[in-house]
């Protein structure tokens, strides 16, 4: 198992917390299924089948946020509300007013909710207390914010901060393309996005296309900046760096897969092997990426 997206946060290095202590903090906010009148429920679930809320291996920790959401489209609510309102109008002899329509809609929603289908999703969290990383496997900041909100609620005085680097990803990626060179330990791949800073936000995208230095420089000279760049770290992991310092499309390459523990006898052992490999490599990759962006700086 590998994370696909990395929303990156900072913790003190080292962060002195045990898996047992963290699990105790999470327990009051463990996942509970939606009640008959709830649209959504969120809480911590066990990353493995042993029931523990914190998976811990080699001083690395995994958490898992579970979300249940009822599927009750607004169009369905409105249709049933319209039918119900027509029945009431016939009974009372006049159209329901705004307040009464609101009450009808609430009653319809309460009536439909217990029969609504549910969808479930899970969001993984990796905590590296040794090196001070916390990473959420989420494709958007909004999904990561759900994790952070509940984690802050669960852990008193959580020392979590946003990662701040000396050079913005946009500035750094643009400079790498202009110089036609990648930072130490990285290579530039064939996907990139160049976007103008003006009102029109004109955008050029290269997808699996060789980046011709002269063409790219012309776009940059015309006022565009690099907002997404596909890269590979140490010939081991490919990814896309974005303007917001989010890492997307994380993919372990063949050399990583070859190093996977082939002696694993079952799913549990394979999971342990994957997590040890992933956390070790990603921790080193994040450190190298921060260095490539001029190093970490304190928030002013």
UniProtKB/Swiss-Prot annotation:
Its cellular-component GO annotations read:
bacterial nucleoid; cytoplasm
Q: Where in the cell is it found?
A: Cytoplasm, Nucleoid
> Coding gene?
rdgC
**One term of GO molecular function:** double-stranded DNA binding
Per the record, the GO terms for biological process are: DNA recombination; regulation of DNA recombination
HAMAP family under this entry?
RdgC (MF_00194)
Keywords of the record: Cytoplasm, DNA recombination
Name it: Recombination-associated protein RdgC
On the tree of life, the source organism's domain of life is: Bacteria
Query: Family per UniProt?
Result: Belongs to the RdgC family.
Q: Which PANTHER family match?
A: RECOMBINATION-ASSOCIATED PROTEIN RDGC
Say what the protein does.
May be involved in recombination.
Q: What is its main location?
A: cytoplasm
Please tell me the species this chain comes from.
Janthinobacterium sp. (strain Marseille)
User: What InterPro entries has UniProt attached to this entry?
Assistant: RdgC
Supply the NCBIfam families for this chain: PRK00321.1-4, PRK00321.1-5
